Amino acid sequence: MEYPKIYLALDNCFALKRWVEPETWLPLIKDLGYTSIQASYDNEFDMLYNTKEYIDSWFERLTAAEKQYGAKVQSFYSGYQTYRTSGLAHPDRRVVNSIVEGWIKPAVKIAGERNADMGFALHGIPENIMQNPEKYRECHEKL
């Protein structure tokens, strides 16, 4: 039997307000004894709110800090996306398309380019749809 590779990682969200740049929070996490880190799309480089130039620059800085300190962001996730929209289950297709094109595809691309894992819960089903079996079935099929 081949076992999966498992990392004990520290989420960098605790550093959000005081250690903002990768070169400040990454050595702090390394000093705590972690070499694997989980970073949040939301706190670092939300694709819906930041420019491509900023995101590219952020990753250049992250890569330099990883090399300098011997730690690596192994996974990215989103929690904030979960709370601000019903996401892929939104009844308006325009919202769904915007999330897919503006957030999900760029997030997958970024994680893939870095050979990193990613996770998120990007859908919520509105109550009025949950109470209507036909609408719920349609929504479930879309997901």
Feature-to-residue mapping (PLM):
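Hydrophobic faces of well-ordered beta-strands that scaffold small-molecule active sites
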Residues: I6-N12, I37-A39, V73-S78, M118-F120
